[in-house]
Regions:
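NAD(P)+-binding Rossmann beta1-loop-alpha1 motif at the extreme N-terminus of oxidoreductases
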Residues: 1-58
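Helix-loop-beta segment of a Rossmann-like dinucleotide-binding subdomain
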Residues: 107, 150-160, 207-213
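Nucleotide donor/acceptor-binding cores
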Residues: 4-5, 85, 158
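Rossmann-fold dinucleotide-binding core
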Residues: 82, 118-202
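Hydrophobic anchor at the start of a short beta-strand
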Residues: 6, 28-30, 113, 135, ...
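Rossmann-like NAD(P)(H) cofactor-binding subdomain of soluble oxidoreductases
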Residues: 59-151
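N-terminal glycine-rich dinucleotide-binding loop that anchors FAD/FMN and/or NAD(P) in oxidoreductases
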Residues: 46-71, 200
Length: 213
């Protein structure tokens, strides 16, 4: 199976964990990030502390040197490295509207988007701009800590859910699992997303009260 060419919207904790893991597995990654973050990634690369995941047999922090991926400060520049097979979208929900605004001039160049953001409103918003055939619902239940730009730590390994309703779903599941991301397919995308949101509604206040992560 040919390697995927993947565009990542942002380089936050989830994007770095998933995109970085895919890059470690040999996929081609282009991270679109704010100019300051993109510059940092270009200079220092990425550091992924994945030692918690015993399947990886990683005794030390995994390092991605700057030559092993691309960091671009704008969507226009990132798209010059296309065409892409899929895009990762793991932004905070309050950043979705501005991200969609930036996408508007480039809708014809954008690939299907694997939407990993929390909540249930992001997929409909993306579909409204790009079409339902360009959206693949997904969830992340692993806990990731961010130490700095391109520097993350896997704090708790659970996995990733990917809706199996898209033609790319099977290939994505295979690629994600080859990257040790512990993916599972779900035929009911709405149930998958709502389950994650309800879990967050219960878990987040409890963790705050108990001072747990």
């Amino acid at each position: 199976m040919a390697n995927l060419k993947i565009l990542s919207f942002g380089a936050g904790a989830i994007s770095t964990y998933i995109g970085g893991s895919l890059a470690l597995a040999g996929e081609q990654l282009v991270f679109m990030a704010r100019p300051g973050v993109a510059d940092d990634l270009r200079q220092h690369g990425m550091k992924l502390d994945l030692t918690l995941d015993k399947r990886r047999d990683a005794k030390q922090i995994s390092v991605l040197n700057p030559a092993s991926f691309v960091a671009a400060p704008s969507l226009e520049e990132a798209l010059r490295y296309g065409p892409f097979d899929v895009a990762l979208f793991a932004l905070k929900s309050y950043d979705t509207a501005s991200a969609l605004e930036e996408m508007k001039p480039f809708t014809e160049k954008l690939p299907p988007i694997l939407c990993l953001s929390n909540g249930v409103d992001n997929e409909p918003a993306i579909a409204n701009l790009l079409g339902a055939d360009k959206v693949i619902p997904a969830t992340v239940t692993s806990a990731i800590g961010r130490r700095g730009a391109g520097d993350i730590v896997l704090e708790r390994l659970r996995g990733i859910g990917i809706a199996t309703t898209h033609p790319l779903s099977g290939q994505l599941l295979a690629a994600v699992n080859s990257a040790f991301l512990n993916a599972q397919g779900f035929p009911n995308a709405a149930a998958m997303k709502w389950s994650k949101m309800l879990t967050n509604l219960i878990a987040n206040p409890t963790s705050a009260i108990l001072d747990m992560t």
